């Protein structure tokens, strides 16, 4: 394929970080402009990829994909159905290579970085007009998993909440992810108003918002809880620590929703 661009490399980094969140599982993540259009688990590479792509078929056009296993013939046939810029995977079978090499602009990257290997890298940085910022890489998940609502989340809701929280940490704040236990269904990335990230995620999810869990990296106020409930979302996970926490908890209890606070905001910028 053609040369890998600067933007491709940024998306490659983002998509690798996403699939590394799910050790021991077959995960697929699809990224555009460093934000996930879909993330999913599956019993095979093909199933994980198809599920991730189906989250938002329109946004997935021209994406960068990562799969935390070997891409086989079935998965390659699925990938070739649409325009993909780059596929990053643990490996590619000979049959998969033969299929995908016919896509002249597609780049294939084989790497074990899709697995949660410890690279020994602890810092990351960004350049500024007047210097550089350096910080520790955010390898944590949460400080706590505290159920603050009267209703406790079900086991299925807990799985969906964790899935959503693992993804939302990689989305620019203010962000919201809607998810079921094995896949995202809606992404609301990088909004200046936290409630707008909820609205966008709900709009993207459509009917799939019903029964989903929501993870938000911004403070979740009562208006977001009500918006989520009206869309059929049953459980929410958020950082907590706002002066309006009590109002948020009261609204969740009023609506019979499960609410979890993590004590940590990933606050990706």
Predicted regions and their residues:
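ATP-dependent carboxylate/acyl-activation modules
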Residues: 1-269
